[in-house]
Amino acid sequence: MQFLAWFNMLLLLPCFSTTKTCFPGCHCEVESFGLFDSFSLTKVDCSGIGSHIVPVPIPLDTSYLDLSSNKLETINESMLTGPGYTTLVSLDLSYNNIAKISSTTFSRLRYLESLDLSHNSLEVLPEDCFSSSPLGDIDLSNNKLLDIALDVFASKGQGKPLNVDLSNNMLSKITRNHEKSIPNIQNLNLSGNRLTSVPNLQGIPLRYLNLDGNPLAKIEKGDFKGLKGLIHLSLSGLHDFRELSPYSFKELPALQVLDLSNNPNLRSLTAEVIFGLNSIQELNLSGTGVSSLPKTVLKYLPSLKSITLRKNIQCFKTIKEGQYHRQIGLTKLGLGAEELLWCKTPCPRPVCRCRDKPLQSAPQNLPTP
């Protein structure tokens, strides 16, 4: 049995061989698998050569093709057709000047799992442009998209879990046709856009959502309705952000990580605001105006493990066991008879000195309402 397990492991181990003959200017690397190199795939790097490169002939067993930084202005189906393209698993078209794609551009890439179109000039995404491929990762960051219908990411089949990066575009509107199939998006990055309100994402099986750096002034009750599976929400650095309405996060029972950092105009966090966050483990309030917490914070956040306050002051939940003594560098938040939050205050001296000699002044208590 041990020999069989060892043999099977060897079959799975990749073995990198030397480069092979490739199109002039490109670099081809063969990745072999199996004990006797019985299976191989080729990675083709044709980046930075120039727009004349397409269409480029590639080996039959090509799995990865890099066409980035070639000043490409157009890309169509005919450029991605031919021997070798049918086996593509990953395609990199980043850092070009692509302004337009059609609904059939990627239609023949039946095995494509990763597509990078970041740092281009795309303004519109046509319907069904990604539906023919079993994509798991789509990077559309740093384009010029103004609005988008999330149906464009729906697969004709069941669809595998999908990561979509739409950061640093010009998006002010996110829509979805509820009569069409639900895109299986689990990770969605909308940071650095022009969203003035939380888009309606109801029904999408999101687990990670990033809205950092948008001009959101407030978060209201019901903004996250229908996102019961969300476990990570980032709302950092929102322009002019001032208010969290009561029960803003009530619809997020599975949320484990909430990042509200770098919102200096956020001054308070009431019990009504954090109500319903029964699964939250990490709460980041660094760089905000929040300097106090409700005394009942642990009652409303039963799963909490740590909170970060002010300038990276980290607080950790501990259980009080009998008598205890004040620890150097720690501040107590009195938040219940048995459960306490101990906060590590930044050391005013180099770490080595703090270890050699206790601090002269006791840390101040963080105020509680």
UniProtKB/Swiss-Prot annotation:
Residue positions with a glycan: N76, N189, N284
Domain LRRNT: residue ranges: 20-60
Keyword Secreted: yes
Listed InterPro entries: Leu-rich_rpt, Leu-rich_rpt_typical-subtyp, LRR_dom_sf
LRR repeats: 61-81, 87-108, 111-132, 134-155, 161-181, 184-205, 206-226, 229-248, 254-276, 279-300, 303-323
Keyword Secreted: yes
PTM note: N-glycosylated.
Tissue expression from the record: During embryonic development, expressed in the middle primitive streak and Hensen's node. Expressed in the peripheral region of the developing eye. Expressed in the presomitic mesoderm during somitogenesis in a NOTCH-dependent manner.
UniProt subcellular location: Secreted
GO biological process entries: bone growth; energy homeostasis; growth plate cartilage chondrocyte development; primitive streak formation
GO cellular component, one term: extracellular space
Leader sequence residues: 1-19
Pfam families associated with the record: LRR_1, LRR_8
Alphabetized PROSITE patterns for the sequence: LRR
Keywords, sorted A to Z: Developmental protein, Glycoprotein, Leucine-rich repeat, Repeat, Secreted, Signal
A GO molecular-function annotation: BMP binding
Miscellaneous field: This factor is named 'Tsukushi' because its expression pattern in chick embryos is similar to the shape of the Japanese horsetail plant, tsukushi.
Quaternary organization: Forms a ternary complex with chordin/CHRD and BMP4.
Function summary: Contributes to various developmental events through its interactions with multiple signaling pathways. Dorsalizing factor involved in the induction of Hensen's node by inhibiting bone morphogenetic proteins during gastrulation and by enhancing DVR1/VG1 activity. Wnt signaling inhibitor which competes with WNT2B for binding to Wnt receptor FZD4 and represses WNT2B-dependent development of the peripheral eye.
Name by which UniProt lists this protein: Tsukushi
Source organism of this protein record: Gallus gallus
